[in-house]
Each structure stands twice: as structure tokens, then as C-alpha cells.
């Protein structure tokens, strides 16, 4: 379950036995959040995003950006400042990730990094956006990044006036 300052959602994931097809199912935990906005804007349920795997995410980002693909706004600098605390010994070049807005998730227990790098495009086909991921022995869904992305979407909703500080939502009750 993911809870932002104003809204929340419940997420469950299904994976094929070979791991090549993964389907997360998300449900709004209260009104006025990103799922409610999606349902209202597109008249019901649908596909939110499609993920593509790549072997070198920074190089993939550079190629896609050069071809004109627009990406979601990067998380604040504090996200990258906190990476060493959240994933000690991860070994990734933080400035390279930060300059591209690439998110990092996984675990580094027992000095054995299992990492997931990910980035998201702007909406590309109606409401659908693309996710680009690089797996370094991590088979998760970027649960730690899910919270960071959720918070960045919530900030965008505040900026657009969909959410308003001080107004109670179902998730904040």
C-alpha cells in the first residue's frame, strides 16, 4: 500500500512464471487521487503504462531523449542525496542518475546489491506512459521508487489544482 500526504493506493502485482510478463493492479485508497483522476478523465479503467527492459538505462535514456521523448519530471535532489542511506554501497554513479532523473531501487544487504533502475516518460498515447527499466539482479517492481513516484505525481496534482492543501480527502480521514 502506498500513502502520500493527501491520497493513497493499494497495489498488487501478478507475474508470469518466467517473469517476462508482469501486471500490477492498482486501486484508489480514497477519492481525488491519481487513480480517481485517471478514471474520470478516461471514463473508466485502462492501462496506465507499459514497461520496457533495457541493458544500459543511461544510454537508453540518452538515445530516447535525443529522439525527442519527454520524461516525467525528476524527483527532487533530496531523493538522490538519500540514496546512500537507503541503499548503502549500491555502487551506481549518483550524478549520472540525477542528471537524467533515473530512479534507483532494490537492496544492498550483505554487500550484495540487487538493483532496479527506472525512469518514466510523459503520457504518450492518451493516458499511457512508458517505463524503462534496467534490472541488476532485482526482480521487484521498484516498490521504494513507487513511493517517490507517487509523491511526485501528488505534487503535480497540487500544482494543477486537482488536490488542494488543507482540503480533506477520503485517504486523509
Q: For each of these PLM feature ranges, what is it?
A:
Residues 3-173:
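Glyoxalase I/VOC metalloenzyme domain signal
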